[in-house]
Amino acid sequence: MARATNLNAAPSAGASGPPDSLPSTLAPPSPGSPAALPRASTPCGLSGFSGLNIRSTSSMLTKPLQGHPSPPVTPTQPPGGKDRAAFEAEYRLGPLLGKGGFGTVFAGHRVTDRRQVAIKVISRNRVLGWSTVSDSVTCPLEVALLWKVGEGNGHPGVIRLLDWFETPEGFMLVLERPMPAQDLFDYITEKGPLGESCSRSFFTQVVAAVQHCHARGVVHRDIKDENILIDLCRGSIKLIDFGSGALLHDEPYTDFDGTRVYSPPEWISRHQYHALPATVWSLGVLLYDMVCGDIPFERDQEILEAELHFPAHVSPDCCALIRRCLAPKPCSRPSLEEILLDPWMQSPAEEKPINSSKGSPTPLPWSLLP
């Protein structure tokens, strides 16, 4: 399938040129955006959308990079966004990494130690939600959510907001940038279906990252392969792009800015959903994508029917977990804790060979097994 797009993000026709909110004095030369790699010729079945989907904004920081992993740095969120002069003194903007409906992402580095970062630039008129962080300081909701999940030591599986700045035109979010790294969409596109040991490792880390977010009162609402960043040196993952996220609550949500092919049937049929079962549904789609090499559903009717077909190489235990996560009724889906206790998660089985046109996945350069 083609790379999917957030429902309400107006895709850009291209990634060249500076963003609307970035002053020309800061705009670097624009090399253009890396092309999205389609997995199949059939476009995603998004209602009211046709043509090839463009990758989501924050996943642009996942362009494969060369270099050595950077040491962890504690995020430093000021009570209010600093201004343009402070940004120019503290950071240098690098090449354009990509452009999407909610903003533009550049490479960059911090002046003091040349630490590589990603700089997400958001136009003020494209901010969908606002929040108050402290002392009545108003900021984009995405900043507040990243702050909440990054407070204290944060979590190794969640991207860190290092800094943020406010200009008359919009906002600049400075995010950590593991190097070298690749998003899970590109990784699967390159490797084909992943082995179950690799999938189990990635999936366990994603579930743990989601648990951390929920413990901090944040629901991501756009869990998908494009928003999973793989540190290619360590074999660890990070959950990125909180632009569709929200504060976690028990009441049903009636808005959704995530990716439709990962959305649950209750949203398709009733335009409402609860955070926890909807999250588990998207995790089921993600796990299917990892072990099968593509997502299970492309059109609304397929989501509603939830009919699953598995290649022969996928083990019965893995199939069973995916079926549990993709149960049509929200009340029938497991909790995050129950997912981690599932037999497939607890008892790795010997894998069957994968017959793929791309060949079996290349052995990873890091230890994934307990």
Curated annotation (Swiss-Prot):
Could you say which EC number(s) this protein's record lists? Answer: 2.7.11.1
Q: Which GO terms describe its molecular function?
A: ATP binding; protein kinase activity; protein serine kinase activity; protein serine/threonine kinase activity
Q: Where is this region: Disordered?
A: 1-42, 61-83, 349-370
Give me the reactions it catalyses: L-seryl-[protein] + ATP = O-phospho-L-seryl-[protein] + ADP + H(+); L-threonyl-[protein] + ATP = O-phospho-L-threonyl-[protein] + ADP + H(+)
PTM: Autophosphorylated.
**Traits of the deletion mutant:** Mice are viable and fertile. Deficient mice shown reduced T-cell activation and expansion in the presence of the serine/threonine protein kinase mTOR inhibitor rapamycin. Triple knockout mice PIM1/PIM2/PIM3 shown a profound reduction in body size at birth and throughout postnatal life due to a reduction in the number of cells rather than cell size.
What does the UniProt induction comment state? Answer: Induced by a wide range of growth factors and mitogens; IL2, IL3, IL4, IL7,IL9 and by interferon-gamma (IFNG).
The record's SUPFAM superfamilies line, in alphabetical order, gives: Protein kinase-like (PK-like)
The Protein kinase domain extends over 91-345
**InterPro entries hit by this protein:** Kinase-like_dom_sf, PIM_Ser/Thr_kinase, Prot_kinase_dom, Protein_kinase_ATP_BS, Ser/Thr_kinase_AS
How this chain assembles, per its entry, is: Interacts with MYC.
Q: Which family does it belong to?
A: Belongs to the protein kinase superfamily. CAMK Ser/Thr protein kinase family. PIM subfamily.
Q: What does this protein do?
A: Proto-oncogene with serine/threonine kinase activity involved in cell survival and cell proliferation. Exerts its oncogenic activity through: the regulation of MYC transcriptional activity, the regulation of cell cycle progression, the regulation of cap-dependent protein translation and through survival signaling by phosphorylation of a pro-apoptotic protein, BAD. Phosphorylation of MYC leads to an increase of MYC protein stability and thereby an increase of transcriptional activity.
Its recorded name reads Serine/threonine-protein kinase pim-2
Q: Which organism is it from?
A: Mus musculus
